Amino acid sequence: MKGINNKQRKQLQLKAITMFFAVLLLSACGAKKQLVKDNNKVVAVNNTTTAPQVAKKENSEALLKLAFIQKVADTKVFNDNITGSMSFSLNTGNKTINLPGSIKMRKNKVIRLQLFIPLLGTEVGRLEFTPEYVLVVDRLHREYIKGDYSQIDFLKTNGLNFYSLQSLFWNQLLLPGQNNVTESDLKKYDVKLAADNASQNIITFSKDKFKYEWKADKTDGRISDVAVQYNSADHGTSLLTWKYNNFKSVGVKSFPAEQEFQLSTNAMQKQKQATIKISMDEVKTDSDWEERTTLSDRYKKIEAQDVLGKIMSAGF
């Protein structure tokens, strides 16, 4: 070039090289590459592949969660009847009662606990749940409490009805306000997948005033623990925990012969807590029994609201 000395020529070449590298950098940005510092090393990350990989990982985790919930749901027994003799224990903090008894449950029909005098075998009390009502019978004093679920304080203030109680007694998942859990309902739950060295995953569900948590075995899906928290602006906070042990074979499935549930609540003016433990001698599927209790005119009906107080005072 005329009129350009060597120094100017070198400057022009340097500018051209600089522009060339600038174009390369812009091209790199156009390809959506960015530099990430990782442990003081510079690593190239390609965004065009990262997003699909993340989506694939999230989708894979969601499928794992759904498959586990399905496994838990599939553990329920097929039989319509669960029966057996039992040992019944009630602890209210300042009083403990241990009595023999029996349990009879018919799916979607009734849950019945009967308590007997030791050795004699005479029935002293009965607690019966049906879809329509709750019945508590005191055989010794010939008194009974009967009311629907809105009339029974400790059930109403804890958001419990027959179907939620049935799910708890039968060692199954539940959804508040629903009679059962369908296949399409399974996606409503979330799962906290445990680490490889842990034995249980945690299933959770929250809605309005309810918080539910189930602990279930990673391998067979069997539920071992349930926690139900109910928060009410009018009635305070209640916590129900339910534990299952000593599973017995019922057909191709299994059923917990030992159940322990604890209710703590401040919903009735003062803090109350009760722990009930049921230990079945064996788990049967007998169907030859009446599903509804009938009482003679000799029994006197008393106030329905304080049924928990009646149970906890163990008047029978």
Residue ranges with predicted function:
Residues G3-T18:
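Bacterial N-terminal signal peptides that target proteins for export
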Residues L25-A28:
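C-terminal motif of bacterial Sec signal peptides marking the signal peptidase cleavage site
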Residues G30-K95, A304-F316:
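N-terminal leader/targeting segments and the immediate start of mature chains
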Residues L66-F68, R139-F210:
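Flexible, processing/modification-adjacent segments and terminal tails
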Residues A73-I82, T92-I97, K104-R106, L127, ...:
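Edge/loop elements at the starts and ends of beta-strands within beta-rich repeat scaffolds
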Residues F88-T92, I117, L263:
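Transmembrane beta-strands of outer-membrane beta-barrel pores
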Residues V110-Y163, S167, K301-Q305:
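An acidic-aromatic
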